[in-house]
Every structure is written in C-alpha cells, then in structure tokens.
Amino acid sequence: MPQLSLSSLGLWPMAASPWLLLLLVGASWLLARILAWTYTFYDNCCRLRCFPQPPKRNWFLGHLGLIHSSEEGLLYTQSLACTFGDMCCWWVGPWHAIVRIFHPTYIKPVLFAPAAIVPKDKVFYSFLKPWLGDGLLLSAGEKWSRHRRMLTPAFHFNILKPYMKIFNESVNIMHAKWQLLASEGSARLDMFEHISLMTLDSLQKCVFSFDSHCQEKPSEYIAAILELSALVTKRHQQILLYIDFLYYLTPDGQRFRRACRLVHDFTDAVIQERRRTLPSQGVDDFLQAKAKSKTLDFIDVLLLSKDEDGKKLSDEDIRAEADTFMFEGHDTTASGLSWVLYHLAKHPEYQERCRQEVQELLKDREPKEIEWDDLAQLPFLTMCIKESLRLHPPVPAVSRCCTQDIVLPDGRVIPKGIICLISVFGTHHNPAVWPDPEVYDPFRFDPKNIKERSPLAFIPFSAGPRNCIGQAFAMAEMKVVLGLTLLRFRVLPDHTEPRRKPELVLRAEGGLWLRVEPLS
C-alpha cells in the first residue's frame, strides 16, 4: 500500500526551511494582532452604543468634516450641546471614536481622574513637542507630577505680587501707542495684535527679566514665537503634514525648525548666564540681591527649585518650562482680554460701571497703578471678565485619552483607549447648564449666584490635577490691563461683527477690531 509523506509530496524541504517558519510566525503574530484589534474595536462599538450620536456623513467618513475651525463650527458645537445635553459619540472616519462631553456631571470623572489614567491626547500636542519639549503642557506620568510639584511655588502670590509693576508698565506702553493712534479722536485697532504684543512684553520680563521693547520695535525672539504659533495652527489643518518626515521637507517645516532654534538659543543663553551668576554669588547672596529688587523671575524660581530628594531641574527641563510658559501665557491672555473688551464695547452700561469702579479705587492715587491688594477691590470688573471667559473661553476644548475604563455617574462607561473631548465652549453654551447661554450677563458671577451651580459649569482654565497652573497670573494681568484701559479709553464696537475662529486659542477671522477714544 503506497505511503504518503511530506517528502513524497515534495513539501519536506520547504517545511524545514527557517524562512517558512519565520513567515508562519510573522503571519500568526499579525493575525493575532488583527483579531485582538477587531475584538477590541467590536467590544468598544458595543459599549459606545449607550452614547447618542448625531447623523454621520457616511459610513467611511463618520462625522469627519462636520465641524470646522470657524464660526459655523462653533455654532454646530452649540447645537450638539443643545440637542444632546450631556455628551455624544463622534466618529472620525470608520474606526476612531471620540466622546464629546458638554455637562459638569460627566466632566468631573474625566478631569478629576489621576493624570496617569487620563493623559492628554497626543495627536495634536505632538506638533508642539519640538518647540516646548517635556514641559507641563506635554509631559506625562511621574515626570509631569514631579514638575508640577516643583513649579507650584513659582505661582505663589508672594512671587506674583512684584509682577504687578511689570503689568502696569507694559499696559502703559500699549496705551501710549493708542494715544498717538487716536490723536485725532478715535482709532480702529485689532485688539489681538496689540494685546498679544503687550502680553509677550510682560511675559518676557516676568520669565527672563529681559526687556526687548517689542511693543515699540521688532524683536526677533517675539517674531519667532508668533511664527511658531501660526505654523502649528496651519499644520493642524493639513492632514498629510501630520507625518514629521513630510512636514520637515516643506518650507513651513524648515521655517518651524529655524524658529525653534532661535527660541531655544535665546532661552539657553539666559539659563547659562544665570548658571554662571549663581556659583559666583552663592545662593544666599543671589537671593539677597533679588530681594532688594523684590522680583524673582520664572527662570530664577526654576533654577532654585528642588524636589523631595533635593534634585534640581536640568537645563533642558528649565528651557521646556520657560518656553511652555511663554507659549501658554501670551495667546490665552490676549484672547481673554480681546473678547472682554468686545463685550464691554457692546454693553456700554457694564463698561461704565467697571470704569466707575476703577476710578473710585484709584481716585487719590498717583501714578494710577493697580497693585496686588487692589485686585480684590474690583468685584464687578472681575464678574465681567468671567462672563466673557464663559462666552468666549480662550481654549475651546481639552482632550484626554483614557488609559482605563472611566465609569460615569449614571453607570455608563467610557472604554479604555477612547479619547474624551471636554468641550469647554459647549459646556459654557449649554442651556441645561446656563439659562439663556448666549446673553452676556456678568451677574451670573455675583457671589450669591455662584453657589447655585456646579464649579465645573465654568472651566476656562480647565479643572482637576491638570488645570492651568498659571490662572492666578492670568487673572491678575487681565484685571490690571482691563482696569487701566477703561480708566483711560472708551471702547466702542466696530461696524463689522467678528466671526469667531478657534485655532490654538479662540480668535476672530481677520482680527478683532474695536474703536478706542481717549477719555482725556
């Protein structure tokens, strides 16, 4: 009886081949990965069915392209908050799901989860990495926790108090320009352009103790920061350039590298100069000299910071934190100030009440400067700032990637691996959270009204362990700038209504134009 064997079939030599074994192992590994991904995807789809979703464009695109960085995109976000009330599921293509959240009840489990469980989503933030490094904005895990603990003293009120003089000086320079431009009665100004330069001027003095006179003449360093912000925004809108290799072949990618190098060289030079000063003076003499000038800048605080084990930050870490503060501190504050001036121009009765509050505070004072202790004496002006931050939050959304299942108060579960988009704008415009959300009403922030709602109904600085570490700095600067601006100028609306444009921060298409009239 004939016997069948591998050799008789001519298969034995191939079966013994190491290449075939390698191919089988590789194919098995790939098949296992595909099956695991398919199971996870199917399981997530089943678990996401409890979240409502708006109609898709089609099965392949999902909801991709339904929201643009435009006025219409913001209006669509408002409609989602109105329609769904708390949250919805959003598909980017056929595979990628995002849970968009619009309600304080469901924001809390995500933002207040430990930072290791819900780190920031890296898709967009990765564009900033070559510029900002592993600063607080982009770092994660133990490194983020260590840096957060070490940086917290930099924002203590004793450190912030001396910055008030810098805020006053910088806004005085901006106002001197406005007085010249309005010498014939009034001037039409793009608030973003003027206020961005002013905030960068203040930050450069607070971070580096360096005065570039950028409000009066061009500064290469300031121009590089503005260019980097614009290039990151532009790249975000070009999906093919998400790939680093392709991006750095383009003229924009090369400009980005040059601007990064310039910014890093400036920061490194300041750090090295301080490093040389410290050994020659000693820490005690250095602090004594700083005490006489009453100002410790951000670089000083970082150089002197130590963790629980007595370890200091490296020069690379210090550069990352300084560059992060320059990036995060100028655009967000400029956006907040520009929009509050817009609202007060549209509501002259609130503008006049703010002006009277500042006049009463400074009536017997020369020069007219706002000091740290004055900040608590401007309650109505503070209410106006907060209501503007509600309607026009500088950062319209923040994202988190769930590294484990997040259980919501109603029992629903956001599966591991899903990105949560906390819609700050949607929450602030949600009629289930804020009655008549489109009305500018500063009295929402009257102390007696605040206690009636969730603290997470108002989150312009985010919330939880990864909230904005510089919010006290930002609020202090906004109060000084707004108070002195209203003391010296009447702000009037422009004839064209701005169209909002969410980029890195909430801007206006073509600038936010207002008219200013000197009061004396």
From Swiss-Prot:
Reaction(s) the record says it catalyses: an organic molecule + reduced [NADPH--hemoprotein reductase] + O2 = an alcohol + oxidized [NADPH--hemoprotein reductase] + H2O + H(+)
GO BP terms in the entry: arachidonate metabolic process; fatty acid omega-oxidation; icosanoid metabolic process; leukotriene B4 catabolic process; leukotriene metabolic process; lipoxin A4 metabolic process; lipoxin B4 metabolic process; menaquinone catabolic process
UniProt keyword terms in alphabetical order: Endoplasmic reticulum, Fatty acid metabolism, Heme, Iron, Lipid metabolism, Membrane, Metal-binding, Microsome, Monooxygenase, Oxidoreductase, Transmembrane, Transmembrane helix
Keyword Metal-binding appears in the UniProt entry: yes
Molecular function GO terms recorded: 20-aldehyde-leukotriene B4 20-monooxygenase activity; 20-hydroxy-leukotriene B4 omega oxidase activity; arachidonate omega-hydroxylase activity; heme binding; iron ion binding; leukotriene-B4 20-monooxygenase activity; long-chain fatty acid omega-1 hydroxylase activity; long-chain fatty acid omega-hydroxylase activity
Topological relation to the membrane, as annotated: Single-pass membrane protein
Membrane-spanning ranges: 11-31
Subcellular location: Endoplasmic reticulum membrane; Microsome membrane
Pathway, per record: Lipid metabolism; arachidonate metabolism
Obligatory cofactor(s): heme
Enzyme class, broadest EC rank: oxidoreductase
Activity regulation note: Inhibited by carbon monoxide (CO).
Claim: rRNA-binding is one of the keywords in the record: no
InterPro entries: Cyt_P450, Cyt_P450_CS, Cyt_P450_E_grp-I, Cyt_P450_sf, Cytochrome_P450_Monoox
Assigned EC number: 1.14.14.1, 1.14.14.79, 1.14.14.94
One Pfam entry name: p450
Function, as annotated: A cytochrome P450 monooxygenase involved in the metabolism of various endogenous substrates, including fatty acids and their oxygenated derivatives (oxylipins). Mechanistically, uses molecular oxygen inserting one oxygen atom into a substrate, and reducing the second into a water molecule, with two electrons provided by NADPH via cytochrome P450 reductase (CPR; NADPH-ferrihemoprotein reductase). May play a role in inactivation of pro-inflammatory and anti-inflammatory oxylipins during the resolution of inflammation.
Family the entry assigns: Belongs to the cytochrome P450 family.
Protein name: Cytochrome P450 4F3
Organism encoding this protein: Homo sapiens
